[in-house]
């Protein structure tokens, strides 16, 4: 379904955040017979609905909103509307077509788009792809989940999008190059279960992309994709890390060395994998990666890591404090822990409790000497899951500030204090930015 298909139709836009606002502006320009906006009360942070928005799409709330959705020819939902929402189940029962702004946009722009998703690494990888393309004279527009809604993007010859599982779920067109960085259970409450989450995430690949690029080291991706023909970044046939001319790790394309691993300023093997995926995407887009390796090395060296993703905080004590507040699952926390392998490490875990299974984290730490400090709400349950591991020291504190204070006392000189919560921020904090702010302030307040 394209935007132009909405001409003369009764359309309801469900959600009044930035995606809903972009949808109203775009749809209004295509002459729907009727256009309304529906707010189900699930968000309290949307700014006022006034001016052009109120004129083009009057706002309806409560039970009246549910009725307007059911009466529409097409419903355009915001990504924040979960698949488990009871109103959505009723729309599906009535066979009311439901789509999203990203799906409408993709129908017109798929052939010019690189779409990146993944349970972890999609923001960094999509940012790297856009950054490296620009460095080799391939101008592009970057947006999606990480930035500007797709329906607000300007005209361009090439787009790079970060796409969430929610945005992927309603796609009926795949981008020219579909990219998946990692796959593990996430957002299960919104998708209805693990299988449903994988289905929605991998819907990015379901509609005939020209090329699929994946992290070839991810076992779940390998299992889900089977023998499907894909480019498996991180394997010897394509972009990967191996010993280089000087004996240190280098990025390679096949058997050809590109530049040293040390050029990449981001820590962790998972970030090596993210860059391998990005370089593989450039390769399939026709960039002569080998010929442009010097230019790419300079661009990689200048890449600034994204906030709240293994962001190191300077501290006069000699300890390294690390903000990885966006690690909202045990698998993401495991990647962060691995990034500081070989250093004395204290990790702070806990947040909103979604009932996740922390057995994988326990297995990962079975032979690791580490201190784990739990904070509400799920911190005590995570710590309990680690009970009995001989090399893991565990504590539980009442809040994040107390956890930082304790971490200072128990972490050896030169060690790392890592906030990698393995849980979302809501409940104790307004959002992940607020959790990050509280952590950084606690580091400052407890210094000296």
Curated annotation (Swiss-Prot):
Gene Ontology CC, one term: cytoplasm
Keyword Nucleotide-binding: yes
Alphabetized InterPro entries for the sequence: Mur-like_cat_sf (IPR036565), Mur_ligase_C_dom_sf (IPR036615), Mur_ligase_cen (IPR013221), MurD (IPR005762), MurD2 (IPR043687)
Signal peptide: none
Pfam families associated with the record: Mur_ligase_M
Keywords per UniProt: ATP-binding, Cell cycle, Cell division, Cell shape, Cell wall biogenesis/degradation, Cytoplasm, Ligase, Nucleotide-binding, Peptidoglycan synthesis
Enzyme category, top tier: ligase
Chief subcellular location: cytoplasm
Binding locations of ATP: 118-124
Metabolic or biological pathway: Cell wall biogenesis; peptidoglycan biosynthesis
Biological process annotations from GO: cell division; cell wall organization; peptidoglycan biosynthetic process; regulation of cell shape
Gene Ontology terms for molecular function: ATP binding; UDP-N-acetylmuramoylalanine-D-glutamate ligase activity
Intracellular or extracellular location(s): Cytoplasm
Reaction catalyzed: UDP-N-acetyl-alpha-D-muramoyl-L-alanine + L-glutamate + ATP = UDP-N-acetyl-alpha-D-muramoyl-L-alanyl-L-glutamate + ADP + phosphate + H(+)
EC number: 6.3.2.53
PANTHER family: UDP-N-ACETYLMURAMOYLALANINE--D-GLUTAMATE LIGASE (PTHR43692:SF1)
Function, as annotated: Cell wall formation. Catalyzes the addition of L-glutamate to the nucleotide precursor UDP-N-acetylmuramoyl-L-alanine.
Family assignment from sequence similarity: Belongs to the MurCDEF family. MurD2 subfamily.
Protein name, per record: UDP-N-acetylmuramoyl-L-alanine--L-glutamate ligase
Gene: murD2
């Amino acid at each position: 379904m394209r935007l132009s298909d909405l001409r003369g139709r009764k359309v309801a836009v469900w959600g009044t955040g930035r995606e809903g606002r972009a949808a109203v502006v775009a749809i209004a320009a295509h002459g729907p017979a009727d256009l309304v906006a529906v707010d189900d009360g699930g968000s309290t942070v949307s700014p006022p609905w006034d001016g052009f928005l109120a004129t083009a799409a009057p706002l309806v709330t409560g039970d009246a909103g549910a009725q307007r959705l059911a009466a529409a020819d097409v419903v355009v939902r915001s990504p924040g509307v979960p698949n488990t929402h009871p109103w959505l189940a009723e729309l599906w029962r009535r066979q009311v077509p439901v789509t999203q702004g990203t799906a409408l946009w993709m129908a017109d722009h798929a052939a010019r788009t690189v779409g990146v998703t993944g349970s972890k690494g999609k923001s960094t990888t999509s940012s790297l792809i856009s950054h490296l393309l620009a460095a080799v004279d391939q101008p592009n527009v970057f947006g999606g989940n990480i930035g500007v809604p797709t329906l607000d993007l300007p005209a361009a010859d090439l787009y790079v999008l970060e796409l969430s599982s929610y945005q992927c779920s309603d796609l009926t067109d795949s981008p020219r190059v579909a990219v998946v960085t990692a796959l593990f259970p996430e957002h299960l409450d919104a998708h209805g279960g693990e299988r449903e989450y994988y289905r929605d995430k991998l819907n990015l690949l379901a509609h005939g992309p020209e090329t699929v690029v994946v992290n070839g080291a991810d076992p779940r991706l390998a299992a889900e994709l089977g023998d499907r023909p894909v480019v498996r970044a991180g394997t010897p046939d394509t972009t990967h890390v191996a010993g280089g001319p000087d004996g240190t790790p280098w990025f390679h394309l096949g058997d050809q060395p590109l530049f040293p691993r040390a050029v990449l300023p981001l820590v962790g093997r998972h970030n090596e994998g993210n860059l391998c995926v990005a370089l593989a995407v450039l390769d399939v887009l026709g960039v002569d990666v080998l010929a442009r390796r010097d230019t790419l090395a300079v661009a990689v060296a200048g890449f600034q890591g994204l906030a709240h993703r293994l962001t190191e905080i300077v501290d006069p004590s000699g300890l390294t404090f690390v903000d990885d507040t966006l690690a909202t699952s045990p698998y993401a926390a495991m990647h962060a822990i691995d990034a500081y392998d070989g250093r004395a490490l204290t990790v702070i875990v806990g947040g909103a409790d979604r009932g996740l299974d922390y057995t994988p984290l326990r297995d990962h730490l079975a032979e690791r000497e580490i201190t784990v400090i739990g904070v509400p709400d799920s911190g005590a349950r995570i710590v309990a899951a680690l009970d009995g591991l001989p090399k893991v020291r565990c504590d539980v504190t009442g809040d994040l500030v107390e956890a930082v204070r304790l971490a200072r006392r128990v972490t050896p000189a030169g060690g790392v204090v890592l906030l990698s919560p393995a849980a979302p921020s809501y409940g104790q904090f307004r959002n992940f930015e607020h959790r990050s702010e509280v952590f950084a302030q606690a580091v400052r307040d407890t210094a000296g």
